[in-house]
Amino acid sequence: MMTSLLTISMFVVAIQAFDSSEIRMLDEQYDTKNPFFQFLENSKRSDRPTRAMDSPLIRFGKRAADGAPLIRFGRAPEASPFIRFGKRAADGAPLIRFGRAPEASPFIRFGKRASPSAPLIRFGRSPSAVPLIRFGRSAAAPLIRFGRASSAPLIRFGRK
């Protein structure tokens, strides 16, 4: 009788030790207490904020708040995303951006609704520079250009 009681109590303690962290966070959020183990809980287990208050670093899904990034690097939830996938966003929002300034011109931009001056692939620091690789209908923009002279492309595929 004593061994079975000891076995059951050890089993309950082991189950309590392997409690899911999700359940712990929900318990902390709603301030629920376990009536059987109140003496074990002296204080809350963590001082971290709940997940409902945090903006996700990586989010998958279509429905989100306007401007919510899909992949974000940094602690500020309102930070401009470095990598964004989606159709419904501002026309100037980059899909892939390298740099800290959110108003920086994108290096790589894919989309139909981009302004004609927006580069599809650009290498360099100056956003006003002609892109090195540009795929589009504009005949003035080079398709592939290597070198410093920006007057004419070295490789051009097109009608004009």
From Swiss-Prot:
Probable FMRFamide-like neuropeptides. Binds to neuronal receptors such as dmsr-1 to promote sleep in response to cellular stress also known as stress-induced sleep (SIS). Plays a role in behaviors associated with SIS, acting in concert with the FMRFamide related peptide, flp-24 and neuropeptide-like protein nlp-8. AADGAPLIRF-amide: Inhibits muscle tension in somatic muscle. Acts as a ligand for the npr-22 receptor in vitro. Acts as a ligand for isoform a of the dmsr-1 G-protein coupled receptor in vitro. One of its GO terms (cellular component) is extracellular region. Residues 1-17 form the signal peptide. PANTHER family: FMRFAMIDE-LIKE NEUROPEPTIDES 13, FMRFAMIDE-RELATED PEPTIDES. Residues 18-43 form a propeptide. The keyword Signal applies. One of its GO terms (molecular function) is neuropeptide receptor binding. It comes from the Eukaryota. Expressed in the ASE sensory neurons, the DD motor neurons, the 15, M3 and M5 cholinergic pharyngeal motoneurons, and the ASG, ASK and BAG neurons. Its main location: secreted. GO terms for biological process: neuropeptide signaling pathway; regulation of cellular response to heat; regulation of circadian sleep/wake cycle, sleep. The gene is flp-13. The modification Phenylalanine amide is found at F60, F73, F85, F98, F110, F123, F135, F146, F157. It comes from Caenorhabditis elegans. Disulfide bonds: none annotated. It is found in: Secreted. Belongs to the FARP (FMRFamide related peptide) family. This is FMRFamide-like neuropeptides 13. Keywords: Amidation, Cleavage on pair of basic residues, Neuropeptide, Repeat, Secreted, Signal.
